[in-house]
Amino acid sequence: MAVKDFMTKRVVYVSPETTVAAAADIMRDKGLRRLPVIEHDKLVGLITEGTMAEASPSKATSLSIYEMNYLLNKTKVGDIMIKNVLTVSKYASLEDAIYIMLQNKVGVLPVVDNDQISGIITDKDVFRAFLEISG
């Protein structure tokens, strides 16, 4: 069983110039926890709920809500994204993808073919595959 058989093919993504606030809106509206960052049709990074939380001002900040919103609307995804993203080929076995995810404690692997993203495989996709295989 190959990654291509279980990956999500319709990938929602953002560009490095997208604001953190806009990326957060997309993630909330689509029910996603992470987004690949694409520039000139190439994967350049990944933004997650965790990276956005780390970039957000502390709840104990003295900034007003308006100042926090201003910061989130000025900060670009490219400034806070994970740049060294683990990827997998669509021809890799599902077992190899699971191994990479477990070894590196990640819940997502962009599926890259010839430097272009062709899908994404997440922990949820792996669970669905398990259910499908086990009957």
Model feature map: region roles:
Residues 1-10, 48-85, 98-102, 122-135:
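Tandem CBS (Bateman) regulatory domains
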Residues 8-17, 43:
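Short N-terminal signal/transit or membrane-insertion segments
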Residues 14-31, 37-39, 81, 87-105, ...:
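The conserved cystathionine-beta-synthase
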Residues 27, 35-51, 101, 109-125:
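A glycine-centered beta-loop-beta connector
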Residues 31-33, 39-40, 62-64, 72-73, ...:
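Short, charged/polar low-complexity linear motifs in solvent-exposed/disordered segments
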